[in-house]
């Protein structure tokens, strides 16, 4: 097992990113997506040049094991210094610190961009994600009970925030 490397995603990573993500809409309530977004969606996310938009991957040797990205929390200009974040890992990357490494690098970039607040929306139950967000300093600010319907069951989301400035 080699050392994990975290850095900016490239267009050549997007097929691997899509393959990692594809598992989650099909099998889990970790995302409330029910279908895989098209490759063009991932490319648009990668191509965004808005301040505070980042797309990172974590690798072991040449294999992409996970990804993290940040984007607009809301489109209205007053929200410009608030970003929403997401992290997804391949199953074989779990338990290796890959998620925390990705998130830590993403938060460093957001601090450098002078982002004020980071928001994470975590579908429940998700004890692993909850623990990672707590360890990174996020605080829980509320829960939207039964806000989504997936696999015939209602899913709640917990909202977390981290103040960077």
List PLM regions with ranges:
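A short beta-loop-alpha structural element at the N-terminal edge
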Residues: 4-19
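Helix-loop element at the rim of GNAT/NAT acetyltransferase active sites that forms part
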Residues: 19-36
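Acetyl-CoA-dependent GNAT
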Residues: 34-92, 103-104, 109, 163-164
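Conserved catalytic-core motifs of GNAT/GCN5-like acyltransferases
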Residues: 69, 77, 119-122, 134, ...
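Conserved beta-strand-loop-alpha-helix junction that forms the acyl-donor binding cleft
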Residues: 94, 120-130
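Conserved acetyl-CoA-binding loop-helix of GNAT-fold acetyltransferases
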Residues: 95-109, 130-135
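Conserved GNAT acetyl-CoA-binding A-motif
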Residues: 110-122
């Amino acid at each position: 097992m080699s050392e994990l490397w975290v850095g900016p995603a490239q267009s050549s990573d997007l097929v691997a990113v899509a393959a990692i993500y594809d598992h989650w809409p099909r099998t889990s309530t970790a995302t409330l997506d029910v279908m895989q977004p098209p490759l063009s969606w991932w490319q648009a996310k990668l191509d965004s040049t808005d301040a505070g938009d980042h797309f990172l991957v974590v690798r072991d040797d040449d294999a992409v094991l996970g990804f993290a990205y940040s984007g607009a929390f809301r489109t209205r200009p007053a929200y410009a210094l608030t970003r929403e974040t997401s992290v997804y890992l391949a199953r074989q990357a779990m338990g290796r610190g890959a998620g925390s490494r990705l998130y830590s690098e993403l938060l460093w970039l957001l601090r450098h961009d002078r982002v004020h607040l980071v928001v994470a929306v975590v579908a429940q139950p998700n004890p692993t994600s909850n623990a990672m967000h707590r360890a990174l300093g996020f605080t829980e600010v509320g829960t939207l009970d039964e806000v989504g319907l997936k696999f015939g069951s209602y899913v709640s989301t917990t909202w977390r925030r981290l103040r960077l400035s």
